Amino acid sequence: GGIICGYNSEEVVLNHVDVAYAGATPTESSASFQNKLFKTTIDGGVPAFHFCNVNGKFVMANSFFHDNYNDQTYFTGGNGVIINNIFADSGNAADGGEAINVKAGCKLDVANNIIYNACTNAFKLSNAGNSEVIPLSEMTVYNNTIINCGWRRSKNKKGGSVWVEKAAKPVFVNNLIYDSRFGLKQPKKDGADMEHSRLTPNYYFASTETGVAQMAKDAELGIWFDTDIKSSVAGQLN
């Protein structure tokens, strides 16, 4: 399993912790399953850290999350700061796995993290789950380094570095996306709230022609900004 917080969890601080090899499928005897937290059926893994209290607070700082079988983090509520962490080797080829997966109900400040080899995305930013009691998320994501993400997912429809959907409106600026499978992407329908988002400037580097092509202006589902800095040929701007 992982660190699965309850609906009444008020405050969590993860500082200088090492969380690894979490995310296995829960059993009927698992505390999270018995309390209907995150999973109500025995049908897949759980994140290494899950927080869900819209009115709660959490801090993740100076920590190392690695080799976790599913998402490293999954947030369906909470006011949080995620700073100075390393997220490495999340997910598995069949099911995928994000480093930071955000749904509705969150207010987050995310900065100065290194994300390496996420199976699918470093960031999946969404407003799924929004309701009368669960507000739209507010996310400020800056000064993060995203390396080599997306390549391990065997069925990759949802990006390879950053995926924005369901009217999410993040501030996502001054991040480095290095040798990841795709650039910033959104679905054809129900994508980002482009009017209220700020998604540029960011820096995108690719050392291969495949990487260049998959983050180019005409890349499928890609979000392009002329104000970004991007490799137009392999190895440019290293």
Would you name each region that the model predicts?
Residues 1-238:
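Extracellular beta-rich repeat passengers
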